[in-house]
Amino acid sequence: MEDLEEDVKFIADETLDFGGLSPSDSREEEDVAVLVTPEKPLRRGLSHRSDPNAVAPTPQGLRLSLGPLSPEKLEEILHEANRLAAQLEQCALKERENTGEGSGPRRVKPSPRRETFVLKDSPVRDLLPTVSSLARSTPSPSSLTPRLRSSDRKGSIRALRATSGKKPSSVKRESPTCNLFPASKSPASSPLARSAPPVRGKAGPSGRATASPPTPVRPVLAPQPPAGSSQRPSRPQGAAAKPSSRLPVPSAVPRPGNRMPLASRSVPSSKGAPPSDSLSARKGLPRPSAAGHRVPVSQRPNLPISGAGRSNLQPPRKVAVPGSTR
């Protein structure tokens, strides 16, 4: 290496001699050009014709031959190139070492942005407010209260429905003509009538609290196979015919007396219908009826509450309906 360093000369230390292309030669060339062409001075800024094919006159005493470099010159250039390459490599190695030392600790230390998102391993986790699973798992009292309220509402709604199912029956019983309208709703009202027989027994003395057996009365007008519907028809006809025919009869007091023995007669025939229902139905119906054979016809729609009563009452129904309606 020492021999190479001694042999190699840098461009800054060297005195370059390019022969005829030296600056001294160029100056002489300019002087010669000026001397040769004093008659045509060059005017800058003005366009003048130039012949690219014209060959400049060769000045005398100048060597313009540029031949290949001698082997000695090539060796010098090679040595200089090698030395430059070695120095550049050393500089590059030093820079890498410096960068490696500086970047080493940086690589070990992760970026703070990643720490903020990974809460399991970060030391900042203790400083964060604890909101997590406890608050979510234990429901707040405010969330429990609306549930209780909703259940209370459901219970109150059911109670209202039960009471409302009983109230319309008393309203309907006030006038015999009202029975014709609910007859169309007989399938919907019949379950209410079936579910509320004990309430009728309790409210029997009132006379108008009985649930909706009068509603099923109408379907008899059209021939229908089900027993419940066939029992109901005789009533609206009789109810509509009786008040129209016997309204002028003023005997309001003896009518309940006539109905009471009829009630005692009809109780054994029902075989399962509570006597209080028949009594309440008779008292609640405001139609005047003096004949005995028509009273059991009006009582029969109250009996379909029990299945046994329906089956037993079907044949007498067919016999009694034509006589009562006509």
UniProtKB/Swiss-Prot annotation:
Sequence repeats lie at residues 38-41, 68-71, 213-216, 223-226, 233-236, 301-304. The modification Phosphoserine is found at residues 22, 47, 65, 70, 122, 140, 186, 190. Residues 38-304 are annotated as: 6 X 4 AA repeats of P-X-X-P. Residues 112-124 have a biased composition (Basic and acidic residues). Residues 213-226 have a biased composition (Pro residues). Phosphorylated during mitosis. InterPro entries: DDA3/GTSE-1 (IPR026657), GTSE1_N (IPR032768). Residues 132-148, 182-198 have a biased composition (Low complexity). One of its GO terms (molecular function) is microtubule binding. Its main location: cytoplasm. One of its GO terms (biological process) is regulation of mitotic spindle organization. Residues 39-67, 92-326 are annotated as: Disordered. Transmembrane segments: none annotated. It comes from the Eukaryota. Residues 70-94 form a coiled coil. GO terms for cellular component: cytosol; microtubule cytoskeleton; spindle pole. It is found in: Cytoplasm; Cytoplasm, Cytoskeleton, Spindle; Cytoplasm, Cytoskeleton, Spindle pole. Keywords: Cell cycle, Cell division, Coiled coil, Cytoplasm, Cytoskeleton, Mitosis, Phosphoprotein, Repeat. Belongs to the PSRC1 family. PANTHER family: DIFFERENTIAL DISPLAY AND ACTIVATED BY P53 DDA3 /G2 S PHASE EXPRESSED 1, PROLINE_SERINE-RICH COILED-COIL PROTEIN 1. This is Proline/serine-rich coiled-coil protein 1. It comes from Bos taurus.
